[in-house]
Every structure is written in structure tokens, then in C-alpha cells.
């Protein structure tokens, strides 16, 4: 089928298309929002653990500036001091790192759900094509991403420069203060600067959320041709469905040809319906339908019955009900036992007549079918 690649995407996406996008790992999740969460958690940790961090760094500096004569003679002491300092640094930042690890994992799950996508790990040679890469380089998506990076650099630089200039006198004070005061004041300066930078990044995050939402639904939108293709995919190609029906009918014909010669009697409409019944007193609990058909198939069943000398009886109401309420290979419904028993009694009389001769048994008349199983019939035709 030829698809018009220039066809405009005007149709709203279906649930099926949204699920396909999610399977491919395509979601509307904003990376800028994730980055903001990481910065916020880092900022909260800087505030929450400020006393612990300042205390541990003060201790590290205090230990670093104390010298003993043994330290110069024993290298192991120096190594031990370095290791202890590293331990203090890790201890200070351990809660900070754990919380960052959690916030890196949780937001994507909250906003996009758990989606394991291994397709991105497969080798795609089209991505190695320099021509395609060059086209992507100048796509609108890349231009927007580049604009966001430049804007972030600009905002962070402007805010940091302005705040450092504003706090210049405090920064100079750190030079003359003792190391504990320097650490505490320096920590507060960094903390305040981070707070202002995070506030400055909020507009970019809001823009990115809106952009990702717009871009996601733009990609999800479908052309009319895609809608038709999806409908075919869901409901099945009509040509394939027709071939399946033809194959099923062919199987039914073969079963009919095999099973009909085994029947005890054929109950007919007589033109529109034919039902072949088999009953073995020793091995069956009730009569069983072994073949049935309407239209042309019904005529074929009757012809096969004549060829194999099987009794045929015309009971239209019973034939219709058996066809409607019985399946091939299954026992007949209980309410039809009495009507079928009358037919089978006539069949056995016919068999006795064939062996012994005499007067041909009279066919049963006025065979009644229960009202709940009465079926007027739909005169279809089978190919």
C-alpha cells in the first residue's frame, strides 16, 4: 500500500498508539524537571546537614594543620591521617549521595511509569548514517535543546556573577577569619547562591514541561492512513479474514465428508438444513451431532447419505433447532431427546425392514420441538 508521507497528522492518538509509544520508551517526561528535582534535593541536603558538614570539614582542617614529629618519621601515620580525612568526607556526604540516588530513580517512575525498553540497546545502522545525523543536527528539536542549554548557562552565569559581586565584602572577610568561621560563612554564601540559581531555573523547567507535552502529542497524532492501518491491524485484514474463513469451511467440508458416512440418520429441512446424528447405545450417553450444514453444504450431506445408504428424514423444526443449538462433536440438547428418540426409533425400524422385509415403516409425524428451542432459521448459504 502506498502511503502519502506528506499527509498531515490531524487525528487524535488511539490508546493502541499510546501503548506502542510507551513500549518503545517514548514518553513525555521532562529531563529538566528531573534535573530540578536533583538540585532541590541537593539544596535541601545542604541545608539539613549543614552543621554536620561544617563540623566534619572543620575537624579535617584541624587535623590537617596539626603536625607532630612522629608524622615526619613514620609515613604510615600520614597515610592513616589521609584515610581518616577521606572517611570524614564520605561520612559527611553519604546521606547527600543516597538521597540524590533516590531522586534520580523515583521521578521518572512517578511521571512515566516503569518501562523497560531494550530496543535502544539494539544496533541501528541508520543512526550511523552521517547524512541522517546531519539532518537531525538542524532539526527543530535540536535547536530547542540548544536554546535551553544556552539559556541555562546564561541564567546560572548571571545569577552567580551578580551574587558573588553582591557578597564580595563577605568573601573578603573569609580571608581574615578563623577557619571555622570561614567554613560557616562560606557555606552560607554557597547555600544562598544555589538557592537563587534554582529559582532562576524554574522558568526553563516550566517551559520544558509544556514543550515536552506539546511535542509528545504532536508525535502521537496520526494521519487518516495510519488510523485505517491500525484498524486493519486490530480487526484483521479483510482479505486475510476471508482466506481464514475459506480455510475453515474447507476443514468443515472434509470433516463432513469423513463423518457423514458414519451417521445413523440425516434430519433435514429438507433444502436449507441438514444435521447428521450418530448414536451408539453402548458408548454414548446421548445422540451426537457429527456433521451439519446449511444451503449447499446441506445438499452435500444429503447426497453423501444417499450414496452410503443412510436414512434421511425431513423434520424441518427439529433440523433447524439441532443446527442452531448443537455443535459438531457434541451431544444434542436434553430438551430435544424425545423428538430425536422418535426419529431414531423409526431408523431402527427401517434397519429391521431392510433385513427382514415387509411393510416399509411409516415416518413419524407431528414431532414436536420445545418452544424454548424453536428456531425459525436464517436461510444462509455455505460456499
Curated annotation (Swiss-Prot):
It holds the Pfam family Bac_export_2. Its main location: membrane. It is found in: Cell membrane. GO terms for biological process: bacterial-type flagellum assembly; protein secretion. InterPro entries: FlhB (IPR006136), T3SS_substrate_exporter (IPR006135), T3SS_substrate_exporter_C (IPR029025). It is a multi-pass membrane protein. The chain crosses the membrane at residues 35-55, 89-109, 142-162, 189-209. GO terms for cellular component: plasma membrane. Keywords: Bacterial flagellum biogenesis, Bacterial flagellum protein export, Cell membrane, Membrane, Protein transport, Transmembrane, Transmembrane helix, Transport. Required for formation of the rod structure in the basal body of the flagellar apparatus. Together with FliI and FliH, may constitute the export apparatus of flagellin. Belongs to the type III secretion exporter family. This is Flagellar biosynthetic protein FlhB. It comes from Buchnera aphidicola subsp. Acyrthosiphon pisum (strain APS) (Acyrthosiphon pisum symbiotic bacterium). The gene is flhB.
